[in-house]
Structures are given as structure tokens and as C-alpha cells.
Amino acid sequence: MTDRKIRQISALLIEVYNGIMQVEDKYLRTTQFRDITVKEVHTIDAITMYDHKTTTAVARQLRLSPGTVTASIDKLVRKGYVVRLQSKDDQRVIRLGLTRRGRLIYRAHQSFHRQMTESFLNGMDLEQVDIIEHSLLNLQTFLQIADEKGDSNEND
């Protein structure tokens, strides 16, 4: 692969990432969820409607420190999107759940991503979709390795 092609794809990745963030932000500003940021929506997405995760589990998924996620969750609790639930199994463990409002934004965000993905894959055959999936898995692996290296550099 040529250096020019790599630069071109790199620029496209940056442009697409920034575009997704801008569109998500614009969408939020036109809904009843004007009081929430895109980062907070991604925290809600990590909490999910289906599991009652701990703050540590959410932090791990978002690749953020537990302290950073705790601050975000505190805001989401104040805004009425998230509740803290005491574990039935272990009273010391606090789990996270979504309020009705949190579930609404969760579903809206899931719908947005589904529409975006369907649009992205529109007109592709299964072989092309498999290539896209393989490429995204390569990117995900790179990000995981880079994240782990960053963690080990912080400990030096």
C-alpha cells in the first residue's frame, strides 16, 4: 500500500470520527436531551439498559479511569439519567441503572448508530461487509494495544 493511500485513509478516519461526533452533538441539541453531552451519552451507552454494571466495569469499557467515570456518573445522576443501585448479593457493591429518561436516550442513541451503520453498508455485498468488519477489527486491536502501552507508560 502506498504512503499516499495510507495518508488518505488516515484523513478519512479522522474526518469520519469528527463528523460522527458533530452529528451526534447536533442531534442532541434538537431533542429533549439538550442537557447532556455526547460523552455522557456514550457513558449511558456503556451502562446499557440490560446490565447493572459497576462504575469500574463502565470505566474499563470506556477506557477511562474510574474517577473520570464517577464524575460523569455523578452528573448523569443529578440530571436524572442514571441511578445507583445497591447490589442484592453484596451490600458493598453499587451498580448502575438507567432511569426512564436514561433508557429513552439509550434507545435513541442505539437507533442513530443502527441507521448510520445501515447507511454505511448500503449497497455492499457480504464479501465487502466482511472486509469492512475485518478492517474494523484490525483497528480495534491496534487501539487496544495502544491503550495497554499507554497504561504501562503511566506506570513507569
Label the model's feature ranges.
Residues 1-4, 130-156:
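C-terminal regulatory/oligomerization modules of transcriptional regulators
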Residues 1-35:
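N-terminal leader segment of winged-helix/HTH proteins
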